[in-house]
């Protein structure tokens, strides 16, 4: 499998803690409902899953934000719940209700029936990865992704999204043995799923631990982080083009556990808006010439509802909070990838996103020229 050479490798260089001319950026959920062209494609597809399972449509919507904004990476258009769906739990999206599963995993029998899914059931995802990588034609790198074992387990036990995580936490505290069995299957499934995305052409992969932050201290390390480690240990290190594949881990609410996360086997840690980038850099960013992790984040997505000049001011504050950019091209050092602290809201005005992108690129360039 061969693809066009990469023209803009700024994102990958920052993942590798190499100096870049500006701070690269992409946005979580950058292909989505805030774009009128996305809504038009989704209407053609008829449903969210109709969109995600159709290679042509998934390719089209992945590229839409790049046509509008000079972003530095594309991310596969899919959903974290494709993996439990392939396990036979029956995923559906009701209009205005969000995802739900026909079957939930709540007792011994349910857990015994769980297995790493036949990856052929997810062929549509891998075909989309290859199709998107071809369509990008080397413009920017393509990021593949999955939910974390813990975050998937939350949906699998609750049967849908939850406000209080009552069912999954009840299982975790009353039958930790069952919880560990679910998480072990999930970790092996996620690793196989991400490896198949790498084989299909993904140039970086990201684990979304969206619900890790709801766990108590101690439980986070045992039930979330431990299984994210199990995923990372199994991931392929080299992509189809012979290049290394950076691994990004994002735990929403995880900023309080940076001491625990600094040693996990990944290249990039994502942060939400509650974390301070400069403090995170001091804990995990490393020194020039030494080991460390790149940081990704972390502006509050709600900043995008403010007028463009306020957006630009908040962008500058985030870039300043990271501190002096790494500029020595001869060695590695602390680097930053600009992103939101969580997914972009469907109500975001696209012109405010344009202001954000312009501010990130412009101001981060000026910081390197001081």
Swiss-Prot record:
Cell location: Cytoplasm
Keyword Cytoplasm in record: yes
Binding-site residues for substrate, renumbered to this chain: 29-33, 79, 155, 210, 342
A molecular function GO annotation: uroporphyrinogen decarboxylase activity
HAMAP family in the cross-refs: URO_D
Cited PANTHER family: METHYLTETRAHYDROFOLATE:HOMOCYSTEINE METHYLTRANSFERASE RELATED (PTHR21091), UROPORPHYRINOGEN DECARBOXYLASE (PTHR21091:SF169)
Annotated function: Catalyzes the decarboxylation of four acetate groups of uroporphyrinogen-III to yield coproporphyrinogen-III.
The protein, known as: Uroporphyrinogen decarboxylase
Organism: Acidovorax sp. (strain JS42)
Lineage of the organism: Bacteria, Pseudomonadati, Pseudomonadota, Betaproteobacteria, Burkholderiales
